[in-house]
Amino acid sequence: MSFWKNKTLAEMDTQEWESLCDGCGKCCLNKLIDDETEELYYTNAACKLLDPKDGHCVHYVQRFNFVPSCTQVTVDNVAELTWLPDSCAYRRLHLGRELPSWHPLITGSKEAMHIAGMSIKNKVTCETKVKYMEDHIVLWPLKDIE
């Protein structure tokens, strides 16, 4: 049942679209943009709604009520969301790439993703505990493996 191989992002139903999200949590990390170079930097400061143990939003359905600036990834905006990590399934499929070998749709569970180091599990701190975002810049969210 490899629906992502037979359908475009636009052809997917809501359940298929949502299942593409591996739950890595990288999109919920605070990001900084250098004013001079416009380079994007990830931090290990996670949204206050992100559970650091499993990478899930604790209020996913109502997240916009709690965090109005939260961005919903859609087929209409995925091309513009250049801050999505290269490992993101939405980004990968949009760019014509395959899902990685560790993706839950391939393996049947999220464990392979965690073992591969592709999630935020046990790597983040809550944004409410961060004083200076600049002190929390990290490179690991940029990692992308097949």
UniProtKB/Swiss-Prot annotation:
InterPro entries assigned to the protein according to its UniProt record, in alphabetical order: Puta_zinc/iron-chelating_dom, UCP006173
Organism superkingdom: Bacteria
Coiled coil (UniProt feature): none
Xref: Pfam families: CxxCxxCC
Xref: NCBIfam families: PRK05170.1-4, PRK05170.1-5, PRK05170.2-5
Classification via PANTHER family: UPF0260 PROTEIN YCGN
Stated family: Belongs to the UPF0260 family.
HAMAP family per the UniProt record, alphabetical: UPF0260 (MF_00676)
Protein name from the UniProt record: UPF0260 protein Ssed_2516
Organism in which the protein naturally occurs: Shewanella sediminis (strain HAW-EB3)
